[in-house]
């Protein structure tokens, strides 16, 4: 594992790291600033820190991330930017049916959605039966009309809704798959973080399987 900072990352740093993991070619500071939506001085500052951590190298053509080191840093330092506390919900339906219903309800209210662990990793690199799924949204979302009931906490929940102020969490960076059967997915690096956050040895195994798929390029959508 690489040495981590004591301060948690902001949304811009996290997005830059996800972007560096997604690309396989050298990228300039200007490209990264445009891609992520932060200032070039901020990009320079983040790249300097990542270079000192041996997670990024500078070449004559731009910056190249070391994917495995960057993923380790992301798992240790990232925290999603949330508007409020996550909201746990419960449903008796099969997991895929639950999330399809959640997505349909979100669409009816004009709410953007990105599906993360457990369901998204199961769609990309199946390993464990999904029992709880984190969903990121850009607005508060009441799931009562979608057939869910409020749960007391994670232990009772089958879905967790996280209202995020970070819109970069609502779509995967190219070339990663952004949807499966029209269901929008979070970036695989965020899925890895959520597997660790939800916890359990089987989820760590699922995260390792997803990491291997990222490192092997198996999740990239062919152009």
Set out the residue ranges of the language-model regions.
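A short, conserved structural fragment
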Residues: 51-61
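Hydrophobic alpha-helical interaction segments
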Residues: 142-223
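Short gly/ser-rich loop at a beta-strand->alpha-helix junction or flexible surface loop bordering the NTP-binding
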Residues: 82-173
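Short amphipathic alpha-helical interface segments
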Residues: 11-25
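Short acidic, hydrophobic short linear motifs in intrinsically disordered regions
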Residues: 25-35
């Amino acid at each position: 594992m690489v040495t981590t900072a004591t301060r948690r990352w902001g949304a811009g740093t996290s997005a830059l790291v996800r972007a560096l993991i997604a690309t396989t070619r050298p990228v300039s500071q200007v490209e990264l600033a445009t891609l992520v939506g932060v200032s070039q001085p901020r990009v320079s500052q983040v790249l300097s820190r990542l270079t000192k951590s041996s997670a990024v190298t500078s070449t004559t053509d731009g910056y190249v991330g070391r994917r495995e080191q960057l993923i380790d840093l992301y798992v240790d330092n990232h925290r999603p930017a949330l508007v409020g506390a996550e909201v746990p919900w419960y449903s008796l339906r099969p997991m895929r049916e639950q999330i399809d219903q959640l997505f349909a309800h979100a669409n009816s209210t004009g709410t953007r959605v990105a599906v993360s662990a457990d369901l998204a990793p199961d769609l990309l690199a199946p390993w464990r039966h999904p029992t709880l799924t984190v969903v990121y949204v850009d607005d508060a979302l009441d799931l009562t009309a979608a057939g869910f009931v409020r749960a007391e906490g994670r232990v009772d929940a089958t879905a967790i809704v996280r209202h995020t102020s970070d819109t970069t969490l609502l779509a995967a960076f190219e070339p990663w798959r952004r949807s499966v059967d029209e269901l929008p997915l979070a970036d695989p690096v965020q899925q890895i973080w959520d597997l660790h956050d939800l916890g359990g040895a089987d989820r760590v195994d699922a995260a390792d399987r997803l990491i291997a798929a990222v490192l092997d390029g198996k999740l990239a959508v062919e152009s």
